[in-house]
Amino acid sequence: MKTFILSLMSLLLFFSATAQTADDIIAKHIDAIGGKDKLSQITSCVTEKNTEVMGNESTTKTTIVNGKGYRNEADFNGQQLVQTVTDKGGWAINPFGGSATPTALTPDEYKSSEDEIYLPDPLFNYAQHGAKVELAGQEKVGDINAYKLNYTNKDSAVSTFYIDPSTSYIIQVVRTGNVQGQETNITISYSDYKKTDFGVFVPYTVGIDMGQFNLKNTTTKVEFNKTVDPAVFDMPK
């Protein structure tokens, strides 16, 4: 009898887990980081970070206007790196990649990064952006048996989101990107979620593995709904 009950409980747990959909998991994620009503109030986000790369440190600033533009700028040993993406295109300055002057992103580079303009992350209101998400089961990320969501944006670029079932936070994203002219799998890890003054939770530690080198970003300041001059997204002539 005891064995039967245990088997029945295991079966019920199995069907409960498999009955979840991608939208169910995303809804829990949205609730965990602040809730739909609060997240819908976000118009912009400006983040300042300390960045460590191969033993070197720099400051990094990321500016996002929801649905309109994304700009990430860093200074490494006097060399300025900038990547900007808007709802219409993008450009970058990367002296380490051979582009010391502003250079337009290639179509493939733009497709893989165009969803950076969405706040708080691309999963929120994804269908309105023309994206699709499917649940691909669960997969280990370290010790966590994370939910695996395959996200396909409107231009068919695919990213894989991993969500911790216990917290509903995004803990990792894997996508294909261009690093120094080569197609590379980029793994982004998120941790140390904290509640901001605005009332939403964001990861204060972000690790980026590009294969050839790794970056670690530690957030020092987050400002939501700050007025942003749209000219910061314009490509210099």
Report the location of each language-model feature:
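Flexible, processing/modification-adjacent segments and terminal tails
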Residues: 20-31, 92-157, 178-184, 234-237
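N-terminal mature ectodomain segment of secretory-pathway/periplasmic proteins
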Residues: 24-98, 134
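Residue-level detector of beta-strand face positions
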Residues: 46-50, 73, 91, 138, ...
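Hydrophobic alpha-helical segments, especially N-terminal targeting/anchoring helices
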Residues: 15, 86, 139, 163-164, ...
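Short amphipathic beta-strand/extended segments with alternating polar/hydrophobic composition
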Residues: 59-65, 82-87, 101-109, 163, ...
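Gly/Pro-enriched, hydrophobic low-complexity segments
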Residues: 145-235
